[in-house]
Amino acid sequence: MKILFLVPPESISIESSVPKALEGGKGYYPKLGLMYVAAWYERATGNTPVFIDCPPEGITEHELLEQVEKVQPDMVAMSIMTFNLLDALHTSESLKRRHPNIKICLGGPHVNMYPKETLDQSNIDYVVFGEGEKIFTELITSLEEDISDPQSLQVIKGLGWKKDGISKINQTQTELLDLDELPFPARHLVDVSKYKHIIGEGRQFFSIQATRGCPAACTFCDIRQTKFRYRSPESVVDEIEQLVNMGVDDLFFVDDTITINKKNLIDTCNLIIERGIKINYKISARVDTINEEVLQALKKSGCYRIHFGIESASPRHLKYLQKGQTPEKVERACKMTRKAGIGFFAYMMIGIPHETREEMLATVDFAKNLKPDYAQFSICTPYPKTELYQQMRDEGIVTEDYWQDFAERPRVDFKIQFWNKNFTEQELRKLQDECHARFYSSASYIMKQITKVRSWPDFTAKARMGTKILTSRMGI
């Protein structure tokens, strides 16, 4: 079978809780999850698949159909989040219209939450839920060995399939993969130069993953209290060397909290130093998982920024979100990070249930006092299957399971709902714009950014983002 791994064109994605001013212009991140699946398939079968990533390549629907005509794939595999479900379904319909015999398989975070609901959609033939690397290859191998007997598919855990138009969902695969057994993502199938991010430190950006899972209990997160696993320092640094040889000099570790296992992270940093690898990189971390030893190792090995999930200045709202941290811990961690010579990005949240306008603006002031390189103020949103969503349903704040309804009946007019009883969506969006304007328009912040500009393209990119933030506040 000829396999096409596809990231569909972006045209009807659901609007997120991030402000419109910051949604565009940030660049494109590689789809590592799908690249891992492609790499496992290639290693296991010896066959080289095709990988088309439409957004960074600027590929339109018409151009995609032309490329598919040339490739003539038997199976098209896409990894989807809830935000791009509509894009995936629209693309599936377009492909099936041209090629009725083509098979469509969907995997990814949305499918993990709603496997049957996704499979029930027309034009979808298979779904993979759970860690898809091994499951997808088992699906293809089974189809190739005995395509006349679909019953053979029922033994593959983590697979959904159809028989006579009826959806069949197999048992969940509960055995987790050994991360050191994973092949490196199939970056050789894409044009690495197409991936960029405007607030990086190097010429060529790409992403990498060293861990999976997070033991923290944040109620708004979909991987809340999941098993934390990590790769060996040798495996991670071998991959970094491969990326450097491909021309990459700016990495983002997409791990939710890479700092959970401090010793393993420090060993990884030390190995980067021992091998003399010159790389710029950034990570994400909780404020209660760093110390001076970790920060020193990160700085020496090339880390230039840490993304902290801070959320709020209010102890009661941090408790409501089950963050497990306090404003004092946040201040201490940010101070240590600055002292170590590492920048940081502050992820903040407004519109938390029962939060007042005064508390939201206090969170902005708190963020300004922390002196981060950047801050983002998202509107608190109960995403599907999260503890926050269930908690808000239990409190009667959310009166209907609208995410379930969307999973069953995806529609273009669907809008994310924010749930603070004291504010309308329009009021929250306006407050969000005001928060960003208050943070980014301060004289001290502007002067700090001017002194850090590395080049004219860097200046113009940041200026465009700043202009978007300010004009959004003025309603332009």
Question: Each PLM stretch: what is its role?
Answer:
Residues M1, P9-V18, I156, W161-A210:
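N-terminal [4Fe-4S]-dependent radical SAM core
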Residues I3-F5, I12, G46-T48, L65-E69, ...:
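Radical SAM enzyme core and accessory elements
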Residues G33, W40-Y41, T48-D178, I379-K385:
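Glycine-rich beta-alpha loop elements in corrinoid/cobalamin-binding modules
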Residues P115-D120, V294, H354-N369:
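Catalytic cores of alpha/beta
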Residues Q173-V192, L388-R411:
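Mobile, glycine-enriched helix-loop/loop "lid" segments at the mouths of ligand-binding/catalytic clefts
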Residues D180, F184-Y347, I352, D365:
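Radical SAM [4Fe-4S] cluster-binding motif and immediate context
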